[in-house]
């Protein structure tokens, strides 16, 4: 299994390669719903694209095309290619422009039956930990759940990969999904041995370049404690993760509506980014300024909401400005 590094797609792409580029998560600031929608529209206007190559068929989750490509070339399921230089399973798992859950599962089953590696992955910009097929399914990350959503077939696709041999200790998944209190990913991974699984293929190949298990769990514990994710801490403890010494942060005081952090962002900026509508409304009622501009990006709370595709938060802010003219 060669180590893959995320590549920048070339500019002179074929239509099928362009579709793949639009459809998949890149884990950069180009990830956004309009790009995924553009891929869907492109496929709708040219339904023959999945027939061009297996990578496009996988990104489209077209079970007939995937089966046809695999029948034509039994080794195709393991071949790197397309604009990202990935194996087909990665295009399927990172696509956000694919078909129904049943179609996705059918494609995954065909690829795995044809020899696809359930632990396929790549090193994002050459860094560890790897972004695996599971990472793509579970989704989310630093750009937020609207820009980097979970796969439409999550959790069924993740369950299939795990049953077919994907290693449950997926460090990048644990990082990407730690920012919000939902624990569905942990429950599924623990059910497949996350707590005590032996070394995975990526750990064995990358060695000291990977975080140790102790470092991985410390990151999870520290974030959960700092953000008062008590259900997560209880879940970790129930599966034998050592939580001794963890100090849960004190309940937060009501944020000062006018205070700014080191980059000039207000509590209203952060509430807009998170899409926290109740907090957004409380801050506005307490005198928060929807026109406040932070210094790092030069954005207002409305700009932050728009960038995170928190459309409801953007609407609340726009309505407030309209109803409270200066």
PLM regions and their residue ranges:
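Helix-turn-helix repeat elements of alpha-solenoid scaffolds
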Residues: 28-35, 59, 63-66, 106-109, ...
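Leucine-rich solenoid repeat scaffolds
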Residues: 233, 244-249, 296-324
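Surface-exposed loop/turn motifs in large extracellular/passenger domains
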Residues: 99-106, 144-157, 181-189
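Ankyrin-repeat boundary/"N-cap" motif
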Residues: 8-29, 48-59, 78-98, 120-146, ...
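Internal alpha-helical scaffold/solenoid segments in large eukaryotic proteins
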Residues: 63, 155-175, 245, 264-266, ...
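Ankyrin repeat domain, specifically the short helix-to-loop turn at the C-terminus of the second helix
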Residues: 36-48, 68-77, 106-118, 155-166, ...
């Amino acid at each position: 299994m060669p180590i893959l590094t995320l590549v920048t797609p070339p500019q002179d792409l074929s239509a099928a390669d362009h579709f793949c580029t639009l459809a998949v998560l890149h884990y950069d600031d180009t990830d956004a719903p309009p790009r995924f929608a553009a891929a869907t529209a492109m496929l709708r206007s040219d339904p023959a694209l999945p027939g061009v190559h297996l990578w496009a068929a996988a990104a489209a989750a077209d079970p007939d095309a995937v089966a046809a490509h695999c029948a034509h070339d039994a080794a195709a399921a393991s071949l790197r290619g397309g604009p990202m230089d990935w194996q087909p399973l990665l295009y399927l798992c990172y696509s956000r422009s694919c078909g129904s859950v049943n179609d996705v599962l059918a494609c995954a089953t065909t690829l795995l039956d044809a020899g696809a590696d359930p632990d396929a992955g790549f090193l994002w910009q050459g860094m560890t930990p790897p972004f695996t097929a599971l990472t793509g399914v579970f989704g989310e990350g630093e750009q937020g759940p609207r820009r980097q959503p979970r796969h439409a077939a999550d959790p069924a696709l993740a369950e299939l990969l795990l049953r077919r041999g994907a290693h449950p200790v997926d460090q990048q998944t644990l990082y990407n999904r730690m920012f919000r209190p939902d624990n569905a990913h942990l429950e599924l991974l623990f059910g497949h041995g996350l707590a005590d699984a032996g070394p995975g293929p990526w750990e064995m190949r990358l060695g000291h370049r990977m975080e140790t298990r102790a470092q991985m769990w410390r990151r999870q514990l520290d974030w959960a404690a700092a953000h008062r994710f008590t259900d997560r801490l209880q879940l970790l403890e129930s599966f034998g993760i050592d939580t001794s010494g963890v100090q849960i942060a004190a309940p937060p005081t009501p944020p000062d509506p006018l205070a700014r952090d080191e980059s000039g962002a207000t509590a209203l900026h952060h509430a807009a980014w998170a899409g926290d509508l109740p907090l957004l409304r409380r801050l506005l009622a307490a005198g928060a300024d929807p026109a406040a501009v932070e210094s790092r990006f030069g954005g207002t709370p409305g700009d932050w909401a728009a960038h995170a595709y928190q459309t409801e938060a953007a609407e609340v802010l726009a309505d407030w400005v309209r109803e409270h003219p200066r």
